[in-house]
Amino acid sequence: MADGTHPLGVDVVNQATGSTPRPYRRCVLTLLRRPLREADATSTFYVLTAVAALAFALCFTLNLVFQYRVVGLDPFQMVLVGTVLEATCFLFEVPTGLVADLHSRRVSVIIGFFLIGVGFAVEGIVATFAAAVIGNVIWGIGYTFTSGALQAWITDEVGEENVSRVFTRETQVDLTFSIVGTLAAGALGLVGLRAPVIAAGATMMLLAVGLWAVMPERHFHPTPRGDRETFGHLKDQLVAGLRIARGRQVVRVFLLVSLLVGLASEVFDRLWRVRVLDTFAMPALFGGDEAIAFTVFALIGTLVSLAASLASGRWLPRRVIDTNPGLPVALSALVQVVGVVGVALLGNLWLALACVWLRSAAMAFSAPIESTWLNRNLDGSTRATVLSMNSQANAIGQVAGGPPLGALATRTSIPVALVVAAVVQAPTVLAFLRVRRTAGATSSVSASVPVE
């Protein structure tokens, strides 16, 4: 062009003067920012939710079976892959968030889904330990591009007053297509255990291309400097969270519990399938096929957890949640510990699976109660800080606890590592019971003192 500017708004070299052009680093962002044909934001959100849920279920239903049977990872390597993923998400949350804060939520989401797809594809196609690590780093970085950006994008597009309805519908869409994806994973698993992982990667990359073509962004405004996530902000959150925890016992307990659960959970989540594969033959009902068996196991687990979540919200008396939440939460924590021990020690396949499902059900049952309990003890000015710190405590626990317990599983046995994990998590039961006793004593002394 005559003025030395590219039609997309990027400076080109001025041949007459030989001056240095502006770098082309904005070119990709500019291309991604403009859809070919804008679609309705709400419809786009539901479609991407459906496709992403389908792809995640495709990948994860048989992913750990694939890592063990096809890639040949030992218990330590399997846990290490998960730890690398957690560490990647933790470290890249802030730098990748700058794209959504400064440039475009749409661009951040598109980049994120594409990288997730690339990570899945690398792991599935190459099928080595190094590829599993690299693939999880890539898709972990991709996840941080979507984390927060997707919710912020749809909130910007439909408005805060309408977004609650959209999120409710999103949950239903996500559950439905997760079940569809689980069934599809089982079908593809009959072809080969790597097939659903590769298919998930291709689906995610196609989703990113589709979003580039139609995803609208009409209401984006850069986040003010003071509201952006930075490492300095994380440090401030840590200091503020610790200050709040010193003054409120219930906050201290939740931070401790999140850390302990993180320390114990990674080894169970990554190795219970290996324990089942090493110890038991697959039922003749499924033709002895591992892909079919673990697909059915996953579906049963999903339905059991859904039922437990509904039971928590609809059947548990409200007065229990309001006046004595520590009791059901402590019982749920106890059930989780018992479930881990059961998987480690029981010699019957269906009893071991029942322990897996019981643990998942206990987590689903207690999650809304814990959320209500913690939020009730926070004011608006500190809620986001404490909730973020609570999540970070769990992530730190997973990164710190996963490798040692994985190494223990490799050097001794998986049952030994699971029992140790249960011992690590056991104090959470006492912690919740202690809060309950303290709260009861406090309320009996003076009604004017807030009951935790």
Show which residues each predicted segment covers:
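Symmetry-related core transmembrane helices of the 12-TM Major Facilitator Superfamily/SLC fold
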Residues: 195-213, 416-434
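C-terminal ends and interior cores of transmembrane alpha-helices
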Residues: 114-127, 334-347
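Juxtamembrane intracellular "pre-TM" segments in multi-pass secondary transporters
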Residues: 21-39, 216-255, 451-452
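Helix-loop junctions on the cytosolic side of multi-pass membrane transporters
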Residues: 200, 208-227, 434-444
